[in-house]
């Protein structure tokens, strides 16, 4: 028997696997060290001690194990641990451990800055506020009643601090000290697509599009740029065009929980109509606020007769639980669940008595929690993607503030040379009646013909959640505008009406055509809203619609969508209806569709490994207003071990309508890989044939080189596990480390803990990782690095001899790569990640004579073996 990494005792008979390499993993029988160490209690002494003769007749054959009598499993040093404070996970970080004052155990050394970041109120702890922020202090000596427990096996540090010394922080709060601005890095995101279309007469047209998003991160600054290229060619023509879309520079202003943006951006559209602009903006960022304080939820007040447990439920789910002291209480950190639903509050007193009451509530977009302020300040010049509008300068400011009893006040101002607008509104949570908001905007505008107009616009929003029926009703806009009301974008037009396009022959004015047409004489008058039921357990019924009328004409925009989605076991089906009519459109579009999907797993055993298990059959039928009907049947699913190859095959028939009858067909493949995504497909309908293709991905340049990835999101995580090539990342389709051990997780959640785990089942036989899980908390737009401690090399069962005898049992063996282990009987020790040749140091006591070093050398063929054996002499 011998000891493996981390002081675990292993039996050489428990090793399994061949020496031929491959994917076989070694399995070890892990037994606690204490099982093999005799502990004898002397009647004459109160302390415990190890009797070495229990292990060997020769005491010199056993190392000094007295430290184990004190529970000291590790020597003092720095260890990466998961920190739990009052049973709540806080963070994962390196912590300095030193011997406790009684010399019996390892104690964490924490600075006042660290304790404050964890939620300890440094001003409530006597003397703590006078200490330098980086002073190393003992928790239980600084805070009366505080305790700690270090779980060496799971590398967890459990801390308890009396509530008296804790800050009043919301649930889910992560201190800004833990936010990671990431590393310096350059980013490139690309998305290329193309297709070739051939018609009945043999004509061919080619189209291509490329979007490039580039970026640079330095500290807390983020620079981004967005550019596109388009290409089209056919018989007798060819055209390609580069277009710059936007560029901006941004950073967080942590103290204000806001973001500063300079360059091309857009205004918030919650009070005034949103517009694109080039300038500067400072605006609140709700992502910096804990989840328990985002959105709107009511503040719950009450009185606890004694120490009681409070439980809050919504729609049958418990969303909050805590223990309350006697007296009045206030709860303002409930996680919002949807946009409403009655809250059932239960207080169970220590004597068994129970208080129960309901808090009905609903929310509309403008509602804020009590005491919460949300603002946005913008200034710059208007930007339009076309050539029909000017670029007038403006300044805009909006504000919302939550008041007690469910009230919210909000408003804003918009100032420009040709435009002035002011808004004032109020919102209210009315309990079982729902939530409502009402605001008014007064505007003064000067149009392109130099005419001046004054007008008002009134907006009413309503929301009611019917918990009993699972229905969420929203009347989003009844908005009424007087004839003289115009928006800021209306004043930017160069002409009063029309539509113009830029061609090779210059600007051409054309006649009105569907939604391309604009006419400032037909400004919006009134519009109304939406009815949106919520999801049920196995089905959803939805109905939504809108209606918009205009001054100066009886034409209207209309839209209606209705549908029913349901599932029976794993068979799903849906029935949907759509109606749309634009004011300048001659016809109304109406479409009715039916769709059913049946997975092949419906007929398979639950433990089936067939490739058809991830496949489904689908049938759909559509009917349009002008008589065209289409039927399609097909097959779709995923392949490969990570389900990262998707496929779809469809065949159908179209009849009626303007184009007569024809057969249709469609086939496609979509691949998601660690280095990018690729797609290809073919379709035919009537006399047209189309071949299309696409390629997308990202490139990240950092201090350690270039790493390819799937398309990049706003916030990224760079996985760094040197030498651990081709290792999968858990819960990431198609993402695995490259040949160097690097990978990019293309998406991460801002200001929240992101857990990144490596799939150890995909590790190579010559790779060991100390920490398979890393947690990071990135700021917006950051590229944060998740570092893993890897040991790459040979797994060795080494027999260490000294002066012809095995080194003492329990000796600590340390390799040059930082790995350590404990020698078992016969001087055997298991070490991983070892080079073919090197040196190890051995220590079995506190004296200078109680240590030695050993050189070893393995044959080259050991690199391909699961476990190698070697004997080394220690001097």
Curated annotation (Swiss-Prot):
One of its GO terms (biological process) is pilus assembly. It holds the Pfam family Usher. The keyword Transport applies. GO terms for cellular component: cell outer membrane. The keyword Nucleus does not apply. Residues 1-38 form the signal peptide. It is found in: Cell outer membrane. Its main location: membrane. SUPFAM superfamilies: FimD N-terminal domain-like. It is a multi-pass membrane protein. Keywords: Cell outer membrane, Disulfide bond, Fimbrium biogenesis, Membrane, Signal, Transmembrane, Transmembrane beta strand, Transport. Disulfide bonds join 852-874. GO terms for molecular function: fimbrial usher porin activity. Involved in the export and assembly of the F1C fimbriae subunits across the outer membrane. Belongs to the fimbrial export usher family. NCBIfam families: PRK15193.1. This is Outer membrane usher protein FocD. It comes from Escherichia coli.
């Amino acid at each position: 028997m011998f000891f493996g990494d981390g002081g675990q005792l292993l039996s050489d008979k428990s090793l399994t696997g061949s020496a031929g390499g491959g994917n076989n993993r070694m399995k070890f029988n892990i037994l606690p060290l204490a099982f093999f160490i005799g502990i004898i209690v002397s009647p004459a002494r109160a302390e415990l001690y190890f009797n070495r003769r229990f292990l060997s007749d020769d005491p010199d054959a056993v190392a000094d194990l007295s430290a184990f009598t004190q529970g000291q499993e590790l020597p003092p040093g720095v260890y990466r641990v998961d920190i739990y404070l009052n049973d709540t996970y806080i963070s994962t970080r390196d912590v300095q451990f030193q011997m406790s004052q009684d010399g019996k155990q390892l104690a964490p050394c924490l600075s006042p800055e660290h304790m404050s970041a964890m939620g300890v109120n440094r001003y409530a702890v006597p003397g703590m506020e006078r200490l330098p922020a980086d002073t190393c202090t003992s928790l239980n000596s600084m805070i009366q009643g505080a305790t700690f427990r270090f779980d060496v096996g799971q590398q967890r540090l459990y801390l308890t601090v009396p509530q008296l010394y804790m800050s009043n922080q919301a649930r889910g709060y992560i201190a800004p000290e833990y936010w990671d601005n990431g590393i310096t890095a350059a980013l490139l995101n690309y998305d290329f697509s193309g297709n070739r279309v051939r018609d009945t007469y043999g004509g061919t047209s080619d189209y291509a599009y490329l979007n490039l998003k580039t970026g640079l991160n330095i500290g807390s600054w983020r620079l981004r740029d967005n550019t596109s290229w388009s290409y089209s060619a056919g018989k007798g023509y060819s055209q390609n065009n580069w277009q710059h879309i936007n560029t901006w520079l941004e950073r967080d202003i942590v103290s204000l929980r806001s973001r500063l943006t300079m360059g091309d951006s857009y205004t918030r559209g919650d009070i005034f109509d949103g517009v694109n602009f080039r300038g500067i903006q400072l605006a609140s960022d709700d992502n910096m606020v804990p989840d328990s304080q985002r959105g709107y939820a009511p503040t719950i007040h009450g009185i606890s007769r004694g120490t009681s447990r409070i439980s809050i439920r919504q729609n049958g789910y418990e969303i909050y639980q805590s223990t309350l002291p006697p007296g009045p209480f206030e709860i303002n950190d409930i996680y919002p669940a949807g946009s409403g639903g009655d809250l059932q509050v239960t207080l169970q007193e220590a004597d068994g008595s129970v208080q129960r009451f309901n808090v009905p509530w609903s929310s509309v977009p403008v509602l804020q929690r009590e005491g919460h302020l949300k603002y946005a300040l913008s200034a710059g010049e208007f930007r339009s993607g076309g050539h029909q509008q000017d670029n007038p300068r403006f300044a805009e400011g909006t504000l919302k503030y939550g008041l007690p009893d469910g009230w919210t006040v909000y408003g804003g101002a918009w100032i420009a040379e040709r435009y002035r607008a002011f808004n004032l509104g109020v919102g209210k949570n009315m309990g079982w009646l729902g939530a409502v908001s009402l605001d008014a905007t007064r505007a003064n505008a000067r149009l392109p013909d130099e005419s001046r107009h004054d007008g008002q616009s009134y907006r009413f929003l309503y929301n009611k959640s019917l918990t009993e029926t699972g229905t969420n009703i929203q009347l989003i806009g009844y908005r009424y505008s007087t004839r003289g009301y115009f928006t800021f974008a209306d004043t930017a037009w160069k002409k009063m009406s029309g539509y113009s396009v830029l061609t090779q022959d210059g600007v051409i004015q054309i006649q009105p055509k569907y939604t391309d047409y604009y006419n400032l004489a037909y400004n919006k008058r009134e519009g109304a809203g939406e009815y949106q039921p919520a999801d049920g357990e196995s089905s959803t019924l939805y109905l939504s619609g809108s209606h918009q009328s205009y001054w100066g004409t009886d034409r209207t925009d209309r839209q209606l969508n209705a549908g029913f989605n349901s599932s029976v076991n794993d068979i799903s089906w849906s029935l949907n209806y759509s109606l749309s009519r634009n004011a300048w459109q001659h016809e109304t579009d109406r479409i009715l569709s039916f769709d059913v999907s049946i997975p092949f797993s419906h007929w398979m055993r639950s433990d089936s490994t067939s490739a058809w298990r991830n496949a489904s059959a689908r049938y759909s039928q559509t009917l349009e207003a002008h008589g065209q009907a289409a039927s399609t049947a097909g097959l779709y699913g995923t392949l490969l071990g990570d389900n990262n190859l998707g496929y779809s095959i469809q065949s159908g028939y179209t009849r009626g309508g303007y184009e007569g009858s024809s057969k249709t067909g469609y086939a496609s493949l979509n691949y998601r890989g660690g280095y990018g995504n690729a797609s290809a497909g073919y379709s035919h309908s009537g006399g047209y044939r189309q071949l299309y293709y696409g390629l997308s991905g990202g490139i990240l340049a950092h201090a350690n080189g270039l790493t390819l990835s799937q398309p990049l999101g706003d916030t990224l995580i760079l996985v760094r596990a040197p030498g651990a090539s081709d290792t999968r990342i858990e819960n990431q389709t198609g993402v695995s480390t490259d040949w160097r051990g690097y990978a990019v997780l293309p998406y991460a959640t801002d200001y929240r803990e992101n857990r990144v785990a490596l799939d150890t089942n995909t590790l190579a036989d010559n790779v060991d990782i100390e920490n398979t899980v890393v947690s990071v908390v990135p700021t917006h737009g950051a590229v944060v690095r998740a570092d893993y401690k890897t040991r790459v090399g040979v797994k060795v069962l080494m027999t260490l001899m000294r002066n012809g005898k095995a080194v003492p049992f329990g000796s600590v063996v340390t390799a040059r790569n930082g790995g350590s282990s404990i020698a078992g009987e016969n001087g055997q020790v298991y070490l991983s990640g070892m080079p073919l040749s090197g040196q190890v140091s051995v220590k079995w006591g506190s004296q200078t004579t109680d240590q030695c070093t050993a050189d070893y050398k393995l044959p080259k063929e050991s690199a391909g073996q699961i476990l190698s054996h070697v004997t080394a002499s220690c001097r």
